Every structure is written in structure tokens, then in C-alpha cells.
Amino acid sequence: KSTREYKLLNMINQKNWFESIHQSNPPKDIMFGVLNKRKKLIGVTGLTYIDWKNRNSEISIYFSTKNWQAKPEAKEVINLIMEYGFEELNLNRLYVEIFSLMKENVKLFKKMKFIKEGQLREKIWRQNKWWDTLIFSKLAKEYKK
């Protein structure tokens, strides 16, 4: 639907991906499970496409619930992954690529003071039409404010 995955998400592909992220050194992806207060897994988040030389990475977030962006946990998860990326890994730039049809995601990252860097016109085909993708980022110096 509105996921950026281009491969079918099934157990075999997920297992292969999970094994591959543990084989690269330094890692190009670092992922974490997201638990609710009852310790139930409700999603995953992490840093993907980590560019160690240029110190930047994409933030990935997948939740099992609809409208996760409106939940208080959404901001908490983004704040934690920013803290990890900027403070623990000493990255300079974290970014997200969001489909323009995912209006709640756009709203959330704007609210979190990510800066819109660009727009890739008609990059994806969903719901029988072309959609743009939007790039938002935050720099380490903006995070520390």
C-alpha cells in the first residue's frame, strides 16, 4: 500500500534481510524493535543506508498499527532514534523519504522540525496515480537546539 518496500515482505525475504544486516562491518543498517507498555512488539525502527564516511543515514519506521503517527509513541521513537544517531553514532544528518500520499507522516516530521530538502516528482505509482516523494532531514546542530 504505502510502504516503500519494492520486494514482497515475506518470512524468507525478511530472514535474508535480517541476516544481511548482521554481516556488514561496519553495519549499513541498525534496527530496533518497538515495544508498547505491555512489552508487545508494535513496530521496528532504525537507521538504514548508513554512510559512515559522510556521517548520514535514513530513518526507517514501521508500525503494525494504523494512524501510528498520532500516537505519543511516534514522537518518542523518533526522538530516541535521533538521540542514538546523533549522540551515540556521531552522525551529522538524518533523513526520511516520505511518499506525498502519506500526509500524516509528512505532518509528523514537520512537527518534529525536520526540514524539507526536496521533492522527487512522480517517483512512485500507487492507487492508480503517480505520487511524489519528499525528503526531510535534520542535522546534528539542529538537533542540539
PLM features: residue spans?
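Conserved GNAT-fold acetyl-CoA-binding loop/helix
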Residues: 1-19
